[in-house]
Regions:
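Donor nucleotide-sugar binding/catalytic pocket of nucleotide-sugar-dependent glycosyltransferases
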Residues: 168-224, 233
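Conserved donor-binding/catalytic core segment of Leloir-type glycosyltransferases
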Residues: 189, 229-258, 270
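N-terminal subdomain of nucleotide-sugar transferases
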Residues: 1-62
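Conserved acidic donor-binding segment of nucleotide-sugar-dependent glycosyltransferases
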Residues: 350-351, 355-362, 371-376
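Short hydrophobic beta-strand element within catalytic cores of glycosyltransferases
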Residues: 335-338
Length: 416
């Protein structure tokens, strides 16, 4: 039976060459939908001379791959750097471009908005952003379903940067904002049950759990050890991959490192990524000499090699939403030590494929890493169980569920 071809508009706050887990996920989604024969219209941030020059030179998959499909079209909306993070974009206000006009010309069956909150301006406390919920005006005028695809736990970011006292004051009004914002969409998809429960308590309307945040389990695989970036270095390796930002708690890895090294003297911490804290992290790492390597960004087979080579993948962030790199490490056969936070318990099962540490507790985090590295039998067992534990989140399996839900939403809208 031939599947019906859908016309799908995807509006995203981040896309290649801007580097983030969101951008990677959006491109994978676009590619999979194109491969199924759907018509995809991607509305993405433009890259311009306001951004650091190295962004344009990143060897990441993006438009060039999508443009090879005849069923693909795109529009780059005007953007500017995020106030406190110049390597990520924010859309210009709707006075400068019109999502309703773009969508009306394409005539989609359904619209997906990836990172809707960020595009609205939540990251910049509304000093930047589109000025209204993206896609909401088109939805009101046409009745075409518009879906918000949740990626970033903005509430966790607010708590992290403002602290508990100010955050608790904001809790009086946050549910009002979240309720009003979520009502602009037919449904908000959450890839984490814990995140969905958290936002439902904050009055998020029409929320729905859908395991759409998959990874390519064929690409991320233990056999990628053949791409080991440092094959002559036989020290036990703990690996972090991600943006080097405050909310990722990268500094806490440097707090935990000497505690780990006291028990595992030849341990090697490798930090892969870039971000605003680059200089600070490099400065702090100097005291540990060759014990810590700040690798910078990594792409392609080199990155695959890092995931497969690592003995333990570490993630101290308390702001993750079903973290992609956690899953990529597990698919590569590498146990994960993360902290207790919404969604991490859905990825890491203590004693099965890794351990969960107390948040913001470098000593407990170090002890969890040490427990793995000083016990070869335990490490082997965790590594053996890591990949099977995450196969249900293979990209194709997740996208088939996602596609099925899109069909349901389109069919329901046509009956109205």
């Amino acid at each position: 039976m031939t599947k019906q071809t859908l016309r799908i508009a995807i509006i995203t706050g981040v896309y290649a060459p801007f580097l983030s887990g969101v951008g990677v996920a959006v491109h994978q989604r676009v590619r999979w939908l194109l491969q199924q024969g759907h018509e995809v219209f991607l509305i993405h941030p433009e890259i311009n001379d306001k951004y650091p020059k190295d962004i344009c030179e990143r060897p990441v998959l993006g438009l060039a791959e999508a443009q090879a499909f005849p069923n693909f079209s795109s529009y780059a909306y005007p953007s500017q750097p995020l106030l406190l993070y110049k390597s990520l974009p924010e859309p210009l206000h709707y006075r400068y471009w019109n999502d309703t006009e773009l969508l009306s010309k394409f005539q989609p069956d359904i619209v997906l908005v990836e990172e809707a909150g960020a595009m609205r301006g939540f990251y910049s406390l509304f000093l930047q952003g589109y000025g209204r919920p993206v896609g909401s005006d088109f939805r009101k005028r046409t009745g075409i379903p518009v879906v918000s695809v949740f990626h970033t736990d903005i509430v966790a970011y607010i708590r992290y940067y403002l602290g508990n006292y100010l955050f608790n004051l904001l809790l009086l009004i946050l549910p009002i904002f979240i309720k009003q914002f979520s009502e602009a969409y037919d449904v908000t998809f959450f890839s984490s049950l814990e995140q969905q429960a958290k936002y439902k308590k904050l009055k998020c309307q029409r929320s729905e759990y859908l395991p759409y945040q998959g990874i390519d389990c064929e690409r991320f695989h233990p056999r990628n050890i053949c791409y080991d970036p440092i094959p002559d270095d036989h020290r036990p390796t703990i690996l972090f991959v991600g943006r080097v930002t405050a909310e990722k708690n990268v500094n806490q890895l440097l707090d935990a490192y000497p505690l780990i090294a006291a028990k595992i003297p030849d341990v090697h911490l490798v930090i892969v990524g870039s971000g605003p804290l680059d200089k600070e992290i490099r400065r702090r790492a100097q005291k540990f000499k060759s014990g810590i390597t700040i690798w910078g960004e990594s792409h392609g087979t080199e990155l695959l090699g890092w995931f497969a080579r690592a003995d333990v993948f570490v993630n101290p962030s308390v702001t993750e939403n079903f973290c992609t790199t956690n899953n990529e490490a597990l698919a590569s056969g590498t146990p994960v030590v993360a902290v207790v936070a919404p969604s991490t318990a859905e990825q890491v099962s203590p004693g099965l494929n890794g351990f969960l540490a107390e948040p913001n507790n470098p000593k407990d985090f170090a002890q969890k890493v040490i427990a793995i590295l000083e016990n070869p039998h335990l490490k082997a067992e965790l590594s053996h169980r890591a990949r099977p534990s995450i196969l249900e989140f293979d990209w194709s399996a997740c996208m088939q569920k996602f596609e099925h839900r899109l069909y349901q939403l389109v069919e329901a809208s046509r009956k109205c």
